[in-house]
Amino acid sequence: MFSIDIQGKSMSLCDPTSKIKQMQQQQQQLQQGTNNGIQKDQQLPNMIINGNSNSYLNNGSNLQQQAVIQQSNHKQSQIKYNSPLSHQQHHQFKIGHQNKLEYLRQQQAQKYNQIYQLDPQLQQQNQMFQQHQYMQNVQMQQQLLYQGNQEVFPPFNQIANGSAQNSILLQQYLSNNKGQTNNSNRENGGNFHSEQSPKSAAGSVVSGNGSNTQFAANILRNSNIIQQQNEFRFQQIQQTHQLLHSLVQQQPQPLSQQHSNQSSQSSNPQSQSPLPLSISSQQPVISMANYFNQPSQQSNSLFNGQQPTMFNSSENFQQKNILYSCVGNPNNPYNHHINNPYLQEKRYYKSSKLPKIKKENKPQQAFSDIRPSSREKSARFHLAASINTILNQNGSTSVNTQNNENMVQTLKGHSYSAVTEKSNIGQQEVNIPTTSKTQTLIKEHSLTNINSASKENNQVTLASNSNQTSKKAYENLMSAENDEEDKLKCIRYFRYNLGQLLHILGKKEIYFSNLNSKKPIKTFASITQQLGQKHMNLLSKNTINIINKVKKIVATKGKYKYRERFNFLHSAQLKSINYDVRKRLNQIQDKKVLSNTKSKDEEESSDDDETPVKSKSNNQNAVQQTDLAKWKKYNRLDPKTKVFIIKGGYGDLRKALQERGWVENPDYFSPCFDLKWTCKVQDIDYDNLQENQVVNHFDNNQTFTSKYGLARNLRTLIHSENIDVYKFFPRCFDLGDLQEFEDFIENFKVAKAESLVHRFKDMLKNGIESIDDKLELKIRLCNEVASRKFIDFYETVDFIFNYDVLPCVSPEEWEIISKDEFQLDNKKIEFYLERLRSHPTFKHLYYSNSQSQKQHMNKRKNSHRISVNHNHNDPIEEESAQSSTSLKQDSLQRFSSKSQELLDLCNQTLKKSSEKDPQHHLNGYRNIWIVKPNFLSRGRGIKCFNSLDKIMDYVVGKETQFVVQKYIENPLLINNKKFDMRQWAIVQDFCPPRIWFFEECYIRLCSVEHNIDDLNNRFVHLTNNIVQKYNKDAYADKDDLMMSQEQFAQYLKETEGRDVFYEEIQPKLKQMVIQSLKSCQDQVGARKNSMEFIGYDFMIDSNYQPWLIEINSSPSMEYSTSITEELVQRVLQDTTKVIVDYSMAKKGTKKNVDTGGFKLIYKGEKQTKNNKVLASYKK
């Protein structure tokens, strides 16, 4: 006995009736509550019927009064318990519960089918068990239906089960008043419900009330009629179950065999053998609701013009009519499963009319009466009907029934890309005229796979077996243009986000259970061998549905939102890497590393030092004015004078505004201004801003100026602009978000394996002394883990969703990959080799045939000869040289085959990575990641790590929110030093945005040469001037750490021989600025007179590919060097030209306004007709 977990629901294989028992208990509780209410009204008649009749007959007057009182009580409760409407509702309620039980059996049958695909032997083992349970359930349903109809009228059973004395009195009294009873029945219409309830009638009879004898007669008469109806209904239901049981057992046949069986059965109806009663071992048992609600195999053939073999003779057509009248007719009041809310989504028809099976001479009308299913949608039916319409318009009436059936099967198989393994469709051809209308119609329904197999005959050929048909459907699905575009979006979105994909597919619990338990290494290769290659080429219908769900999620824009600090103590990921959070925290606290974290987090997040905050007013006696006109009048200014407020060290901006006649308001908190420029967005009161007041920040600008806000919104470009953000933005994860934290852990593990593949490649290429089993295991495992991200996206979803095979790194695999036993540290290896080279016998083991190593060996030989002064003709030396040469040849032959095999494997893995991963070159050899605090600037709190444990030590326990970003391990170096670029830009309005790009940037260099092995040296990796100035040894000439754009462009031109910067780099910078701001335009609080002056940080790799690092709000405007001094003065003067001269000019004169170095590279124009935004690019 074991349990399974499919689609988030747990179910026991050996106990399929657990849900049924639970529903029966609920039904009994409901029935008990109803009977309790009825029993209160039945108490007095039950005492009369089941008690001592002599005592009640002697006290006739008291009984008559009690009967009158009870009669009035029954009249009041007649509507609640005894009206025909209430009985019908009660009956429907019981039938609804039974249909819900059937619905649960249907769901369980679907789960069994998924399990049987994984383990076919399990189907044979549980076949007899399912047969036994199915027959028991059918009998239980029959008994419930029969008993339920008797429980509708409980007084009948009470009268029949009463004392013998009372029953004798009733029979005698009714026999003496037979004529009177018949007359009263005719007067009352034969309906005892019209006057009085059966309970009060029984009481009146026993109490001796002669006027009520007619009701007692009606009770017995109607009870006999209802019993006959129940027996007839029971027989009808029994016939239905037998017919359904035989339908389930019937084997599926190919079309050719079915047509042959039809002809043979029609010619000799007596030769038809009875339907088998045993369940087949090849087809799973399905229930009644499952047969009629699943459009598959034989049930599907009823509605596609295809007749099963059992419905050909006249006798079988009578059975079919019984089946339709008992189960499929919604007009039948006993078929409540059609209107049952539990089966509303599962029912096949929406109307009460059944589809008619057309004759063979009218195949073009086979789709006319089919009602669309509420579960399967209706695309294929509308498509088929439209194709038949086109056939009729074109006069193509030569298509036979068999071709029409094959066309339906083709539409099913290709539209859903899944064909069941048990379908035995023969190889047939469908003639479809390739008109333009047909092609347009097919393209609209995304069924582009129905094409002509050849241009001469225009035919579509079906495969002879299910595997080929499924594979062809899968290939056609992959070749569709729309699906290809959606597939690329999914691949780009989930390329590094495995945790999010597992969460969407509902496999999060399996994912965590995989992390918590150390399982054997389970790779995709082993799964392929276990399941067989045919499963790799099949996509089930569930897989297609889940892929469509994934596509919808990708198409849904992610919203930027604030979130609290993530609690790492509850992460199962930390347990998978053997990271003890509490133990690490205690160690960190003992070393007093966390003593100053709170004070550091409270520092300012701006990139510039602010001037000391002045008082609210220089004149304390002056009253603060809230109206700008009154403030100007109070300060004796012209009403046309413009007023500005600047909070921060922007002296050049202040000077530029004063040159234009603007007056500064010294009160930072005053609402009287035309322009306000601050360092922090918190200094702006957006609620009280006037429409014409200009401010230099947008509300909620953290969507693109914060580190995790930028990373989150850039991912939305995949569906809005179809742009792969990972081509220009290094992958970045927010460690404060649980989903992204899990993505980072898995991505770190895969990147670690790929970095080891790089190092193994160089080691095998340069020569290796020996390859033992452990090293070979690690090399092969690293290649296997690194190549998992290259598996096709649809196959990955199929593995995860259907087989619970997760492409993540298991704890056992990570334990092997993360060990330092075979870590190829250059320093350790060089020391090891130098020590071994001292022994002449083992020289041949450590040298390859490379030219550099041969020269190095010759140098060592010469130096050894000079120091020892050996004779060149010494025979001992010649003998040792010959022996070493022979040993070297033997060793090369011994390891050449295995090392060459492993080297080819590494080359193949890295080649795939370079083709499919846009950030392949960023990974490098060390797997370095850079950790940044979210709201800090100027290089504060930024550190580099290549160890997962060290990253956790630095992050866990701090209140600061961190992001981790992939370090660019192949940066372009200037004089062997790392550098980055600062580029200024201005964005206005945001509805739509207007983006200005400053024509000149500058380069910031590090003061120490680049060395990826020295991760703790901030002067090697951080280019911020505020960081580099603390390096007193190298900061003597600070101008050497800056480079202008012209100098940098000239350096690249001299290096490459062409103008790389202006031809390749700068156009890419403009596009990245545009796309980064467009990604968050619906997240920013758009305002007409708001703007943002921002500074972009870019890096360039060794392939001259620029990468966006971050966007800074209120960038530093300090005169740190002579280069920045000149540029800062220019950019602030030109900023005034944009926000004052250009923005405040009239529409007709804006073209002639000088904007200095700022160029408008993007301007969105509103389209008033459809309220859409059109973008126009300007160079």
Curated annotation (Swiss-Prot):
Q: Where is the composition biased (Basic and acidic residues)?
A: 592-601
Task: Tell me which domain of life the UniProt entry assigns to the organism this sequence originates from.
Answer: Eukaryota
Polar residues: bias regions: 177-199, 614-625, 881-890
Main localisation:
other
What are the GO MF terms of this UniProt record? ATP binding; protein-glycine ligase activity; protein-glycine ligase activity, elongating; protein-glycine ligase activity, initiating
Q: What is its EC number?
A: 6.3.2.-
Q: A biological process (GO) annotation for this entry?
A: axoneme assembly
Q: What is this protein called?
A: Tubulin glycylase 3B
**Lineage summary:** Eukaryota, Sar, Alveolata, Ciliophora, Intramacronucleata
* Gene this chain is encoded by: TTLL3B
